[in-house]
Every structure is written in C-alpha cells, then in structure tokens.
C-alpha cells in the first residue's frame, strides 16, 4: 500500500525490521536503511539504473538481504508542497514495487535533501568530485532520517 500519512505508515511497519529508503534519480538511485529499532538511518549504496525489470529485481534483492519490512521513497515537492513533474514518475515506480512485491511504502518530501547532503560533504572536506559520487546515498539517508524522526514522535 502507498502511504502519504505518517500515522498510517507507522501502523503498517513490521516491528524489528529495517526500513529501506530510495532517493530516485533518472540515472541512479540512492539507497539507505534504518537499523532494526527504526531510529537511525544509514547510507547504504548507489544503484546505477538499467531498466525497469533489473531495477525492481535489484531493489527487491537488497530489500530482502537487509531484512527490510517497508520502504520510504523521496518525492520532490515544490516549495508550496505541490507535486513536481518528476513526482508522477516516482509514484508510478512506487506503485510497480507495491504491486510486484507487496511492500508498504511511504512517500516522504525530499525537498533540499541533495543540497543538505552536498553541503554536509563539503564541510567535512570531501571533494566535489567524490561528493557527486556519494551524495545520492547521503540524500536517501537524510530522507529516511526525516521519516524516522516523524514516526518516532508519533509512537
């Protein structure tokens, strides 16, 4: 099921399972996972997209390998919280994951997550060249931590 309400998503999350997060891009996907207590997000990897079938297969495999029970996908809302054109593509992708793998999925506003990731990497002394290679997984981590903070204030 696709959730937009954190209260509803919280009710659907299996306890003692990790939550997987995706920062969707046209060419690559940043991936992060929570710990099993669902308190802390950790950057995992960047997946370079190939085609829909391979993308879905890879994401499902690492979802299972990391013992995840639900998923968060970042969507880029405008400053007035309206959906952008890219949101439609992301929602279609999310619906394919849900239909094929029956994964409860929450859409989290990802506004400024890439800017925050890039700035964070810059102040830690990581070069711009290297930061461009890892900022998507850091963005996924930021998106997931926002969600974890939100659902843990509800608990």
Swiss-Prot record:
GO biological process per UniProt: rRNA 5'-end processing
Keyword entries, A-Z: Cytoplasm, Hydrolase, Nuclease, Ribosome biogenesis
Molecular function as annotated in GO: nuclease activity
Cited SMART domains: YqgFc
EC number, UniProt record: 3.1.-.-
Enzyme class, spelled out: hydrolase
A cellular component annotation (GO) from this entry: cytosol
InterPro entries documented for this protein: RNaseH-like_sf (IPR012337), YqgF (IPR005227), YqgF/RNaseH-like_dom (IPR006641), YqgF/RNaseH-like_dom_sf (IPR037027)
Protein name: Putative pre-16S rRNA nuclease
Organism of derivation: Wolbachia sp. subsp. Drosophila simulans (strain wRi)
Classification lineage: Bacteria, Pseudomonadati, Pseudomonadota, Alphaproteobacteria, Rickettsiales
